[in-house]
């Protein structure tokens, strides 16, 4: 009996404190209105600052890079010690190494995500795998570049090549694609699985015919975003791909991606016009992939 009385007293006192805190008196109403306006202004300023930073970066790159964009710049070859001419070989190298990296990364990441989400028994081993993936995702790209150089370039004897860069880039993208794909698979409603099991479907039939098609939109969005990030990587490619300006044909050929080309131009200061033009094209490509991912996300809903 005493416990119920104490509970009633505590509840009543809590209500009184809430009423006093939310007093509807004139002074309390003024204070609440003022605090609401202040916090609304703070939130709005934070949102505007974020947007303005992006707009400022885009405007700066466009203003400095757009005058140097031309057909010859996009489809021409760099010439001379000042890297005059175009950047076509760097575009080809970027597409080549990114495509190769995603071809390596995507199947492994999706299969691992399916295992973790659908087949693995939840326990310490699975938690350890997830922790390892999260830790791998947090490794700085320059560290991954050094690791790729030591393993693929030196130990495996692949040299500074497309395949060395693609393998290192795939390792960098693997945990990101795997974890987000796992979340996409887990987002598929359970009742869809239960309905399929109720009709006599096997585990593999449920996964291949129900779960993966239902999660395809989310998985595609994840892959597109990963491609956009891979295109913007520099440190990994700088240590594993080399700097040769040529059109790579074999995976064992070297090359120079756009990010490395931009880094060398800006770092040496030999041709800032070409650097700004390269930055503009690189930014446009990455923004295009981000917009495409956003389109896929909206289409899914």
Predicted regions and their residues:
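Transmembrane-helix boundary motif in ABC transporter permease subunits
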Residues: 101-133, 146, 154, 289, ...
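Periplasmic/extracellular loop-to-transmembrane helix junction in inner-membrane transport proteins
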Residues: 22-45, 60-101, 122, 260, ...
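Generic hydrophobic transmembrane alpha-helix motif, especially the helices
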Residues: 134-172
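Transmembrane alpha-helices
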Residues: 180, 203-239
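C-terminal transmembrane helix and the adjacent membrane-cytosol boundary/short C-terminal tail
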Residues: 116, 120, 182, 186, ...
């Amino acid at each position: 009996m005493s416990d119920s009385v104490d509970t009633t007293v505590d509840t009543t006192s809590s209500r009184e404190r809430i009423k006093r805190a939310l007093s509807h008196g004139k002074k309390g109403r003024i204070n609440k209105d003022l605090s609401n306006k202040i916090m609304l202004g703070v939130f709005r300023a934070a949102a505007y600052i974020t947007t303005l930073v992006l707009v400022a970066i885009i405007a700066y790159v466009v203003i400095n890079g757009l005058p140097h964009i031309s057909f010859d710049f996009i489809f021409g070859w760099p010439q001379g010690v000042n890297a005059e001419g175009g950047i076509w070989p760097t575009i080809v190298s970027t597409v080549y190494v990114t495509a190769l990296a995603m071809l390596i990364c995507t199947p492994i990441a999706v299969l691992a995500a399916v295992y973790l989400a659908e087949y693995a028994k939840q326990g310490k081993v699975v938690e350890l795998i997830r922790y390892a993936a999260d830790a791998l995702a947090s490794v700085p790209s320059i560290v991954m570049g050094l690791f790729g150089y030591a393993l693929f370039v030196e130990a495996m004897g692949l040299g500074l090549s497309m395949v060395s860069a693609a393998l290192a880039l795939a390792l960098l993208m693997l945990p990101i694609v795997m974890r987000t794909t796992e979340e996409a698979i887990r987002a598929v409603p359970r009742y869809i699985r239960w309905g399929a099991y109720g009709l006599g479907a096997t585990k593999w039939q449920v996964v291949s015919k129900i779960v993966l098609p239902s999660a395809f939109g989310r998985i595609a969005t994840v892959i597109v975003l990963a491609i956009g990030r891979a295109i913007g990587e520099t440190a990994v490619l700088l240590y594993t791909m080399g700097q040769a300006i040529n059109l790579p044909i074999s995976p064992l050929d070297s090359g120079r991606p756009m990010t490395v080309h931009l880094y060398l131009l800006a770092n040496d200061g030999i041709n800032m016009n070409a650097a700004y033009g390269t930055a503009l094209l690189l930014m446009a490509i990455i923004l295009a992939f981000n917009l495409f991912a956003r389109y896929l996300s909206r289409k899914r809903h």
